[in-house]
Amino acid sequence: MPVRPFDQMVKANERTTMKISNQPAASKVIAIMSMSLDGYVADLNDGVAEVFDWYMSSGDVEVHTGGSDPMTFHVSQPSADHLHDLVSELGAVLTGRRTFDKAEGWGGNHAWGPAFVLTHHIPDGWPRPNSTVHFVSDGIESAVDQAKAAAAGKSVGVHGADTIQQCLNAGLLDEIHIDIAAVLLGSGIRLFDHLAGTPVVLGNPTTIQGIGVTHLRYPVRKR
């Protein structure tokens, strides 16, 4: 069974430490989410099994994650290549508290690099020794600035519907990467609710066809 060396690609990101400095111009802020064809990223109970199913059973290429809580995905070759390119580009992650809680803090170290969590209250037991998870309570602009600085010229990946919406509304997103899963949920948590200043105009997409998933990458045209 073929294996992609995903864990080797993320080791450099795991060694990255938070360093607040002038942000390199090359840093991009990229929304990254799996979504059903009808626009939901989770069901009404926060379940994500259907939209993440392509990670686990869409092919025979093994993709190993890094971080403190490693996983092994089984995807098609096009999806493995897509993940390789994406992870190679990322230097930090920005999420909301809901995503942090669902992921149980990624074991203290996110596979894609330092993680910045938007929250009103730091959870009990955090921050932890040797963890690269940082908490931000002074707004989306500050969170993006800190994540860009930690990314050291690489891109910042944004997870979570609410955090992505905040970035869009603040004009901070450069690209939207959507993995369209081959499923209709009918109800649940929508990715693109509560948008201000619509329409948000996107550029022409790059499309990669996997098995059970279509990977779309749109540039966001700045207002």
Residues covered by each model-derived region:
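Enzymes that bind and transform nitrogen-containing heteroaromatic metabolites
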Residues: 4-223
